[in-house]
Regions:
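Bacterial N-terminal signal peptides that target proteins for export
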Residues: 1-7
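N-terminal signal peptide c-region/cleavage motif recognized by signal peptidases
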Residues: 13-15
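Boundary at the C-terminal end of the N-terminal hydrophobic targeting segment
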Residues: 18-21
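Second-shell loop/turn segments in exported
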Residues: 33-38, 111-118
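Solvent-exposed, conformationally flexible loop/turn segments
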Residues: 40-42
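A cross-family detector of function-defining hotspots
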Residues: 44-97, 116-162, 168-175
Length: 175
């Protein structure tokens, strides 16, 4: 009888943990920036840029190899966040060469948060409570916890147990 109770308790605890560690869904790749919803992959336009407020910098990052092609990336720097626009997949999606989409969103300030409420300054424990254990990795001296759905990824930079920044981006399918 005790063995069955232990097994039942183990299964119930697994179910509770699994429920808390829900996989990423499409809404996880949308954030609200200056009261404007911005989604990975949405068209980048002058109207969208203006709705986000005044950028302090708009710069050409370069032509970046991604998948089977090279694509143009631009960085748009705002107070608490950056948005990278790119002409990703214009050639395979029958779009104009100079049509851009939101290719990466970087959250740097506590007023910008993910769809699940994680912002720079949140605890690492809070991230794993809402997203699960994720994939931990080190890059250039920084610790990251990452989560992926298809070719989209959310990564949390962790410094001293707190979220320092959050990247929401596409994953190069060659990696």
């Amino acid at each position: 009888m005790t063995g069955r109770l232990s097994l039942a308790a183990l299964l119930l605890s697994f179910t509770a943990v699994a429920g808390a560690q829900q996989g990423l869904e499409e809404p996880d790749f949308t954030v609200t920036l200056n009261q404007q919803p911005v989604s990975l992959g949405q068209p980048w336009s002058d109207k969208l840029q203006a709705s986000l407020g005044k950028s302090s910098e708009d710069s050409f990052v370069g032509e970046v190899p991604f998948g089977d092609g090279n694509y143009k990336f631009y960085r748009h720097v705002f107070n608490d966040f950056d948005v990278y626009s790119a002409n990703l997949w214009w050639d395979s999606q029958s779009r104009d060469f100079d049509s851009y989409i939101v290719a990466q969103i970087t959250l740097r300030g506590a007023t910008s948060h993910t769809a699940r409420g994680i912002a720079p300054g949140s605890s690492e424990d809070n991230v794993t409570e809402l997203y699960g254990p994720g994939e931990k990795e080190s890059s250039d001296g920084a610790e990251w916890i990452g989560y992926q759905r298809d070719n989209k990824r959310i990564s949390f930079e962790i410094v001293k147990g707190k979220v320092n920044s959050i990247n929401i981006n596409y994953v190069d399918d060659r990696q």
